[in-house]
UniProtKB/Swiss-Prot annotation:
HAMAP family: PSI_PsaE (MF_00613)
Gene3D superfamilies named among the record's database cross-references: 2.30.30.50
Gene: psaE
Protein name as annotated: Photosystem I reaction center subunit IV
Single GO BP term: photosynthesis
GO cellular component, one term: photosystem I reaction center
Subcellular localization: Cellular thylakoid membrane
Species name: Microchaete diplosiphon
Membrane spanning residue stretches: none
Keywords linked to the UniProt accession: Membrane, Photosynthesis, Photosystem I, Thylakoid
Amino acid sequence: VQRGSKVRILRPESYWFQDVGTVASIDQSGIKYSVIVRFDKVNYSGINTNNFAEDELLEVAPPAAK
């Protein structure tokens, strides 16, 4: 998983469970939920990003080539 990857969410309690989002950034500092994922649709409170742990994500497409 790297910046720009398309990922499927595997966290059952998430609003975006089984949905696909784009990795916005990855924090290397050692925190548990280090991957920020951006989505096309917003959740109930109008937010379109969330932090996930790497083991809660399944990469479905690599980042687009520049």
